[in-house]
Amino acid sequence: MASVKSRVFAITGGASGIGAATSRLLAERGATAVCVGDISCKNFDELKESMKKINPATEVHCSLLDVTSPTEVEKWVKSIVAKFGNLHGAANIAGIAQGAGLRNSPTILEEGDEEWSKVLKVNLDGVFYCTRAEVRAMKSLPSDDRSIVNVGSIAALSHIPDVYAYGTSKGASTYFTTCVAADTFPFGIRVNSVSPGITDTPLLPQFIPKAKTSDEVKEVYRKEGFSVVKAGDVARTIVWLLSEDSSPVYGANINVGASMP
């Protein structure tokens, strides 16, 4: 079992889906504190209550956070260190989807400027802002095993002739993560990526907008050769990378589920 006991973590996009599963698993494994930043406060109360039942000793702090704002991100990370005096690990999970099957071929001609900018702003710029703030905070703390995990996607590998912004954002995020890993490892900060396959989360239907039900979405992917994994499957990999058990792994990109159909 990956050890995260008595450690402090920051999770973006932590109020639902993979983020919530990661937050709950950290509590289950004995984390001292889990600090969640999310663009929506809708699930905060439910998350806090569920984590309290899992482990009353884990402190849970939920904050509204827009990862596209470097000012907000820096302030949020600083507030965690100010409150707990430490930051052992961070998982940058916040992201948005892009719907497939909505464009006529050649699909590149229908990839809009606004959508392109929006997706890259959250999925790439957000990862950059968060990683930078976390490295800044961790470097100023006493030497310890510290870990950052950025969540990518198999979309970065599958070369789909559609949803260009999403695939590009995830591919660039994974490349960025590998480069940062080489930069920060000498300072005791490990940085890695996790690239989930098709994952059963509230975000899943947004990838196939024409589907009428979640089951229909899953069936579309199954017919294309993809397995469907659960948020908890991805969370276990993230928590392992956040834990001391994964040391000295850095610069890795771990696929969860099929990397390619």
UniProtKB/Swiss-Prot annotation:
One BP term from GO: indole alkaloid biosynthetic process
Record: residues binding NADP(+): I18, K48, D66, R132, Y166, K170, T201
Keyword Hydrolase: no
Signal peptide region: 1-20
Pfam families: adh_short_C2 (PF13561)
Keywords of this entry: Alkaloid metabolism, NADP, Oxidoreductase, Signal
EC identifiers of the protein: 1.1.1.-
Enzyme class: oxidoreductase
GO MF annotations in UniProt: oxidoreductase activity
Domain of life assignment: Eukaryota
Residues at the catalytic site: Y166, K170
Metabolic or biological pathway, per its Swiss-Prot or TrEMBL entry: Alkaloid biosynthesis; ergot alkaloid biosynthesis
InterPro entries on file: NAD(P)-bd_dom_sf (IPR036291), Sc_DH/Rdtase_CS (IPR020904), SDR_fam (IPR002347)
Keyword Signal (UniProt): yes
Function comment: Chanoclavine-I dehydrogenase; part of the gene cluster that mediates the biosynthesis of isofumigaclavines, fungal ergot alkaloids. The tryptophan dimethylallyltransferase ifgA catalyzes the first step of ergot alkaloid biosynthesis by condensing dimethylallyl diphosphate (DMAP) and tryptophan to form 4-dimethylallyl-L-tryptophan. The second step is catalyzed by the methyltransferase ifgB that methylates 4-dimethylallyl-L-tryptophan in the presence of S-adenosyl-L-methionine, resulting in the formation of N-methyl-dimethylallyl-L-tryptophan.
Family, as annotated: Belongs to the short-chain dehydrogenases/reductases (SDR) family.
Official protein name in the record: Chanoclavine-I dehydrogenase ifgE
Organism: Penicillium roqueforti (strain FM164)
